[in-house]
Regions:
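Alpha-helical transmembrane segments of integral membrane proteins
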Residues: 2-6, 99, 103-136, 152, ...
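Membrane-water interface segments at the C-terminal ends of transmembrane alpha-helices
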Residues: 25-32, 61, 73-75, 142-171, ...
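Small-residue-rich alpha-helical segments with characteristic i,i+4
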Residues: 18, 131-152
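N-terminal signal-anchor/signal peptide hydrophobic helix marking the start
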Residues: 9-15
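Juxtamembrane/transmembrane-helix interface segments of polytopic membrane transporters
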Residues: 22, 26-30, 156, 160-164, ...
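Transmembrane alpha-helical core residues of multi-pass small-molecule transporters
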Residues: 14, 22, 45-46, 116-117, ...
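Hydrophobic alpha-helical transmembrane segments of membrane transport/permease proteins
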Residues: 19-71, 167-185
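An internal, D/E-rich "acidic patch" concept
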Residues: 1-4, 62-122
Length: 318
């Protein structure tokens, strides 16, 4: 237990250092840019009203030395003070208010997509492993390979054109409407988001299960006369947990990248959409906040994965 606690503390310290490094790099990359976010806000009024220009710079703290801006930003992070939006349509709004709208939407999209991917990918991977080299195995693996390798930015417009425009089965955009309309809006983005993940899970689970089924303890269990269902679900299934945990990192990366693509194609007001909008409008405080938020989420999930590894496999703690 002491080894586990020491391992967890070391990983926690590493997590904090990584988040601090990401925060620092993101801050200085945006602040050292030659672009002045205040000038586009005033436009032609800048020449006739320079006082407003300096007032806005003071409001956003841009008139302070860079080191003081950095320390002020770090001091505000524990209080969720992420600065104020510099984009004209949301000028002066706290960045955290914008994130409070986008985070639940992205979490909902990601959770439903992940659940659907698990419900499809794991059973397909299981059947493929149990029916190795059969027609079912080859067919399912081919389909999973296709949906895994085709990127969402290719699938999304094709699905919108065919399913939404030509067949008119589902809406091509929107999110959050009440009742049946809201459910119909969710179907296409969730299915497209889950498709690649399902293929990834199916291929990974099949590979892990086939490897475990070759182990000596599986042969011993079968030699003892245990039912095949018990061997598969109890002995083999339990031992696929560790290798399955190894794909959490790639899964998180896929979720982050997929959210950017799917949310923008379907007009979903999540973190991905907010980030892309901030980049196109050069809204640096929002870019900083979303970058730090997404990076922290990925690093934290990897931290939990490391702790899980150490919990189920004591050799990792050494």
């Amino acid at each position: 237990m002491q080894n586990l606690l020491a391992f967890t503390l070391k990983r926690l310290v590493a997590l904090i250092l990584v988040v601090w490094a990401i925060t620092t790099i993101t801050f200085f990359l945006t602040r050292l840019s030659p672009y002045d976010p205040i000038r586009p806000l005033l436009g032609q009024k800048l020449a006739s009203n320079p006082q407003e220009y300096y007032a806005l710079r003071h409001l956003f703290g841009l008139d302070q030395p860079l080191w003081r801006q950095y320390l002020t930003y770090l001091a505000g992070l524990p209080h969720l003070d992420l600065g104020y939006s510099e984009e004209s349509s949301t000028l002066g709004r706290p960045v955290w208010e914008l994130l409070q709208v986008g985070v639940p939407v992205s979490l909902t999209l990601g959770a439903y997509s992940l659940l659907l991917a698990l419900l499809v990918g794991l059973p397909v991977g299981l059947l493929s492993a149990l029916k190795k080299n059969s027609l079912l195995d080859h067919g399912s693996q081919t389909i999973m390979m296709i949906v895994y390798t085709i990127p969402p930015f290719v699938l999304a417009p094709v699905a919108q054109l065919v399913v939404g425009v030509e067949l008119k089965w589902l809406p091509v955009s929107g999110w959050g409407d009440p009742g049946i309309a809201g459910i119909r809006e969710m179907i296409m983005p969730v299915v497209l988001f889950a498709a690649g993940l399902a293929g990834f899970f199916a291929k990974s689970f099949r590979s892990f299960l086939l490897e475990v089924l070759q182990e000596d303890f599986i042969r011993t269990a079968r030699a003892k006369g245990l039912k095949e269902r018990v061997v598969i679900y109890l002995h083999a299934g339990k031992n696929t947990l560790i290798p399955l945990a190894s794909i959490v990192g790639p899964t998180m990366a896929f979720l982050v990248v997929g959210a950017f693509i799917i949310e923008n194609f379907f007009g979903i007001p999540g973190i991905g959409n907010i980030t892309v909008s901030a980049v196109t409008q050069s809204d640096y405080p929002v870019i900083q906040a979303t970058t730090i938020l997404l990076a922290t989420a990925v690093v934290f999930i990897n931290f939990l994965t490391d702790v899980f590894y150490a919990l189920v496999d004591p050799r990792v703690r050494i």
